[in-house]
Amino acid sequence: MAKVSSIKKNESRKKKSQSLHNKRSALKSKIYDKNISLEERFSLVMSLAQLPRNSSSTRIRNRCELTGRPRGVTRKFGISRNKLRELIGRGLVPGVIKSSW
């Protein structure tokens, strides 16, 4: 089980990222617009830098929903490989069966 503080930190990053997503994407689209003067684009870059670091979506870590494990998390299920294997073995994941050949 992961530390509760690291799980809470990741949750707060998700909330900040969602709340500032529109502002951040609008600034980025204006920064990459070549029709705007260089001085204005530089001021937009500075305003983007003033936003909190944790509002960036790249700082969010995919964690297991059951254990909080940060590595080996499947995108489809949102569960770590260990728990997924355990649940599939018990037959608790619908539509997934253990293969045998």
Curated annotation (Swiss-Prot):
Pfam families per the UniProt record, alphabetical: Ribosomal_S14
- Top-rank taxon: Bacteria
Gene Ontology CC annotations of this record: cytoplasm; small ribosomal subunit
One annotated GO molecular function: structural constituent of ribosome
Q: Does the keyword Cell membrane apply?
A: no
Q: Return the Basic residues bias intervals.
A: 11-26
Which InterPro entries has this protein been placed in?
A: Ribosomal_uS14, Ribosomal_uS14_bac/plastid, Ribosomal_uS14_CS
Biological process terms from the Gene Ontology for this record are:
translation
Tell me the keywords, alphabetical order: Ribonucleoprotein, Ribosomal protein, RNA-binding, rRNA-binding
- Region listing for Disordered, in residue ranges: 1-26
State if Nucleus is listed as a keyword. no
Main role?
Answer: Binds 16S rRNA, required for the assembly of 30S particles and may also be responsible for determining the conformation of the 16S rRNA at the A site.
Assembly and partners are described as: Part of the 30S ribosomal subunit. Contacts proteins S3 and S10.
Similarity remark: Belongs to the universal ribosomal protein uS14 family.
Report the protein name in the record: Small ribosomal subunit protein uS14
Organism of origin: Rickettsia akari (strain Hartford)
